[in-house]
């Protein structure tokens, strides 16, 4: 069974039964949109197996498109029927391709044709929508590339150059300096950087990176490093911390980041960029999770996104007064990456199904549309007081562009926005799922101290290896905390006509692992 089946169905279910599933986020299927709007027609097998040259949708994105198409065009129960037929005597009915056979038996169509139909429907939908979009005028800055290349997190630097994070199909995230269409490689980073956070103030670069513990596999950290662009020296700011989305102040004195306590509370944390000392740490309002904090030019205010069970909102924190001000109410709008601009805050947000750069007026809360792109605009930054930088999504990756800012030409938009593509009626209304839910009584569980020694053994499995020359039978024990593991088996060597007994014990509670085999 291909992985797109499981993951696509999972995405579809979370999208249908939540307000913030991945299927409602424009960036989730943007690669598929970029391919179909550019006229590209990759086959099912090309997308299924991927490429080292071209970038294709992963199994999440392709799976969501296929499973949603099957449920909408055939029957919501078709997905379950395909699975049932696949797992029922697969080696007798079709030992080579049980899944493909089940798809054809259930839908009377093969999977390649279903993929082509889904792609055709998606193309027809988006071509109709984007034909009405008149894209705004922008100036290309990043170098043209033959293969798929992304330039993210653009920020102005010295002598008219830009700092950005470059990545591609065969390229690790790399800090580059771009000027006059020519790029200079500065430093390669790990692939976790794009998720954990990256920012530059033009003279320095800061990022958060994944740092696993050398011994405890379930313990890991997100630490901060800072790079001085004038010397190319890297400095560790933290060790064994959990810092995400770090941002440097313009003067380079402070770093603000989202951190987490051991109680899993999200904290707005201000750090001295030279010493790594924490200057301030504060809980946000409404028990939310802090995302993408960003400094004002004078380093007095910090704007950030807050996410909780009511959706996402936007706040400003005053560093000197230690006060919060809500500037955008909670909603399920997928807002992201706020930055200050005069008396406005610029941010990413979906508008009619496409991510664009918006602005909110800090005086009257009126919102404006700054960009109008057919695929998406991301990573807003200010080159100067009259020029906006952002990453423009194209059929060949995210490219850095600039656009002149003229507040007189900004288009006011409603705070309540309807997405004609993603605010759909899911097909699950046919199943009357609410009728199947039963009220579950409250149950109290006894809380007791865990005894490590009385729970040392926990036999949970037995196994038989029916090897022709060396059949064996054994048992496996692992305690609940995973600190003790026992395996024991007996096997018979037919050639030598002898039984072989083996027992193995591993004790993992302390730093050195103790192994015993007999």
Predicted feature locations:
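Short loop/turn segments that connect beta-strands within beta-propeller blades
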Residues: 178-182, 228-232, 272-276, 318-322, ...
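Acidic/His/Gly-enriched intrinsically disordered linker/tail segments
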Residues: 1-73, 80, 84-126, 136
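A short beta-strand motif characteristic of beta-propeller blades
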Residues: 138-145, 182-188, 233-238, 277-284, ...
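A flexible loop/linker signature enriched in serine peptidases of the S9 family
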Residues: 23, 27, 147-148, 166-175, ...
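Outer-membrane beta-barrel initiation region
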Residues: 147-149, 153, 349, 406-517
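Beta/coil-rich, acidic/histidine-enriched accessory regions frequently appended to metallopeptidases
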Residues: 54-57, 81-197, 202, 229, ...
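N-terminal periplasmic/intermembrane-space "pro-region" immediately following the signal or transit peptide
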Residues: 337, 344, 351, 364, ...
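Blade-terminus and WD-like Trp-Asp/Gly-His loop motifs, strongest in beta-propeller folds
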Residues: 154-160, 197-204, 246-254, 293-301, ...
